[in-house]
A protein has these predicted regions:
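Acidic ATP/Mg2+-coordinating residue in the GHKL
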Residues: 129
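A conserved beta-strand-to-alpha-helix junction within the catalytic ATP-binding
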Residues: 43-61, 116
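Short beta-strand/loop element within the Bergerat-fold HATPase_c
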Residues: 111-121
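Conserved micro-motifs of the catalytic ATP-binding
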Residues: 3, 37-42, 80-85
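Short conserved segment of the HATPase_c
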Residues: 134-148
Length: 194
C-alpha cells in the first residue's frame, strides 16, 4: 500500500496519532465513569489559595510559553485565604479548561488570563482566553457530557466532549458552581466558585 518511504512514514504517523487519540478517549471515559459513579475518592484538605494557584500557573506557564501563548495571572485574594479542596482534582479542572482554551485558540497571539477573586465567603476563579469563542445558542450545553459545538465537530481538533463535563462534576462535588461567558471571535471565560 505504501509505495514510498514518505507514504509509509505518513501512514505510521497517522496510526500513531489515532492510537494516542483513542488512548486519551479511553482514559477520559474511564475517569468520567468513575467520577460519575462516585468511585473516585476525593482527598479534601485545606489549601492556601494564593500559593496553590501560583504553583498551578507556574506549571502550565512553561507549556503555554512554548506554544507562544501569553499567560496572565491576577490574584485578588489575601495571602492567607484557604479553601477546602482536593488539590489533584482541582489541578485536573485547571488543566482541562486550559486544554480547551489551547485546542480552540485561533489567534496568532493567544492570551490566557487566570484571575482569582474574593467574593465574600467564596473564591471565584476565572480563566479567560482570546480564542474563537462559543455561540450563545451553544453556550448552555458546553458542560454536558459528550457535547461538542458545531464548529468543533467539524474541525480536526479532536476532543471527546467529556473534558468540561468532568470539570463540572469536580466543581459540583466540591460544593461549587461553574458557568461560562463567551463572544464569538473574541474569546471565552470559564468561571467557577469554591
Amino acid at each position: 500500500v505504501a509505495s514510498s518511504p514518505e507514504k509509509r512514514d505518513k501512514y505510521i504517523r497517522t496510526i500513531y496519532n489515532k492510537a494516542n487519540d483513542m488512548d486519551r478517549l479511553i482514559n477520559e471515559l474511564t475517569f468520567y465513569s468513575k467520577i460519575d459513579t462516585n468511585k473516585i475518592p476525593y482527598t479534601f484538605s485545606k489549601i492556601n489559595v494564593a500559593n496553590y494557584f501560583r504553583d498551578c500557573v507556574e506549571e502550565v506557564g512553561l507549556e503555554l510559553e512554548a506554544r507562544g501563548i501569553e499567560l496572565g495571572y491576577f490574584n485578588f485574594v489575601d495571602e492567607d485565604v484557604m479553601v477546602i479542596a482536593d488539590a489533584e482534582q482541582m489541578k485536573r479542572v485547571i488543566n482541562n479548561i486550559i486544554g480547551n482554551s489551547l485546542k480552540y485558540m485561533d489567534k496568532k497571539n493567544g492570551i490566557i488570563n487566570i484571575r482569582i477573586l474574593d467574593v465574600g465567603d467564596f473564591v471565584q476563579v476565572e480563566i479567560e482566553d482570546n480564542g474563537k469563542g462559543i455561540g450563545q445558542k451553544e453556550l448552555p450545553y458546553i458542560f454536558d457530557r459528550f457535547y461538542r459545538t458545531d464548529s468543533s465537530r467539524n474541525s480536526s481538533k479532536g476532543g471527546s466532549g467529556i473534558g468540561l463535563s468532568i470539570v463540572k462534576k469536580i466543581i459540583e462535588d466540591h460544593g461549587g458552581k461553574i458557568w461560562a461567558t463567551s463572544k464569538l471571535g473574541i474569546g471565552t471565560e470559564i468561571h467557577f466558585v469554591l
